[in-house]
Structures are given as C-alpha cells and as structure tokens.
Amino acid sequence: METLTAISRWLEKQHVVTWCVQQEGELWCANAFYLFDTQKVAFYILTEEKTRHAQMSGPQAAVAGTVNGQPKTVALIRGVQFKGEIRRLEGEESDLARQAYNRRFPVARMLSAPVWEIRLDEIKFTDNTLGFGKKMIWLRNSGTEQA
C-alpha cells in the first residue's frame, strides 16, 4: 500500500491534532479538531488570533505535532508525528476551507475563529498493528516514501 495513502486513510478517521510552535526559544502546544485534505496533505483548523499559539505563529510559522489514538495496548498503537508550516488563510482560500470544515464539523458554523492551514512537509506514521515498531515515512519535497 502506498505510504501516503495509508497515512491519509488513518488521518481521515481521526479528528484531533496537537501542534507546537516556538517563538524566541519559547515553545507552546495546542489541540484542535481538524479537517485533513489528502490532495494538499494539510490539516485545516480553527483557532482565535488572541490565543497564545496563534500569537506565536503570526501569519505563518514552522510547526510540529502529532495525531494519535488512545489504545489500551502497545500492539494497537498508531500515530503520526509531523513537521511543516502553519499559516492563517485569507479570502477565498479561507472561505473554501471553512466550507469544507463546516461540512465535517457542523457545530463550527457557530464559530468566527480564523481558518489556519498546517501544511505537512514530513510525516512519520507508526502502526504497531502491522508489527511492533512499524514506521512509514513520507517527505513532501523529495517524493520519498519509506515503509
């Protein structure tokens, strides 16, 4: 199975991302419900500009994070670690992402928070259901996939 396809299928079944940003040596992490775009390999989230993580991100910033389940045994651990870039969307790009986000999370229609894109440049997917410590790696710019 193609690495990105396997990762995308799993991410589409999850809904909470943890991401971390840094500014002047200070780190901060946050959680949010996400919409995953398989074509752009990106998460879309809503978060207010007044939050600490949004203030630290500014209009765009380097980001790293995780998506994971809550398995009861080590044999069932599956999760993603990633790095990339977070940026606030504007105009039509924001409108289109918000429409898609609202389809997945209808309650979000009540929120006015800006839409942010987390573009993934590197993904490591651990899937112990395929064997203990099984890792799949996807890199945006090299076209490299490792299983």
Curated annotation (Swiss-Prot):
Q: Which HAMAP family match?
A: UPF0306
Organism, scientific name: Escherichia coli O7:K1 (strain IAI39 / ExPEC)
Q: Which residues form a coiled coil?
A: none
What protein name does the entry list? UPF0306 protein YhbP
Q: Of which family is this protein a member?
A: Belongs to the UPF0306 family.
Please spell out the taxonomic lineage of the organism that makes this protein.
Bacteria, Pseudomonadati, Pseudomonadota, Gammaproteobacteria, Enterobacterales
